[in-house]
Regions:
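Juxtamembrane/disordered regions of integral membrane proteins
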Residues: 1-92, 96-166
Length: 166
């Protein structure tokens, strides 16, 4: 059990490290463009230099599908490693583990990364919008968290089924 909990903790820290490394310049910050408040997105789209880098609008259902596929692959790899090292005793154990894993990651992303770090660090600010107040609206983050609840439930069900079959 300790190893399974450690995997979740390490994954959360790696997830945050990825967010940290993926920010710091205007170009890097464009990767997380949809996480920015709508007002910031509008200002970036009006900026002559950065508007060229702004991603096209992607539908939410498409984004959800991409997230499901990505996390099924990632959690599937982790699941196989755990199954053949520390093991799982039943389908229910696998399902509960990956439900907890996904929802802990989702909550960590909302509280630690988005609300505590992201909204307060200068790393995510665009050079032509340095004022902190532009980045304080949590709506995009909360909406993402709410979608994540469903995404990680689906991921847990799919991964559990695959792990049970293997």
């Amino acid at each position: 059990m300790v190893i399974k909990v450690a995997v979740i903790v390490v994954f959360c820290l790696l997830f945050w490290a990825g967010c940290y490394v993926g920010t710091g310049t205007d170009q890097k910050n464009m990767k997380g463009f949809r996480s920015y408040p709508i007002k910031v997105q509008e200002l970036v789209r009006r900026n002559e230099e950065l508007s060229k880098l702004a991603p096209k609008k992607v539908s939410i259902p498409f984004t959800i599908l991409l997230n499901i596929v990505m996390f099924v692959v990632i959690f599937g790899i982790i699941g196989v490693i755990l199954k053949f090292t520390v093991g799982f005793s039943s389908f229910a154990e696998i399902l509960i583990y990956f439900l907890i894993f996904g929802e802990v990651l989702n909550l960590f992303d909302l509280v630690v990364i988005d609300l505590l770090w992201w909204r307060n660090t200068k790393r995510i600010r665009f050079s032509f919008i340095p004022e902190k107040q532009f980045y304080q609206n949590p709506k995009q983050h909360v909406d993402s968290f709410l979608r994540g609840i469903l995404v990680f439930a689906i991921v847990a069900a799919v991964v559990s089924t695959l792990m049970f079959i293997i």
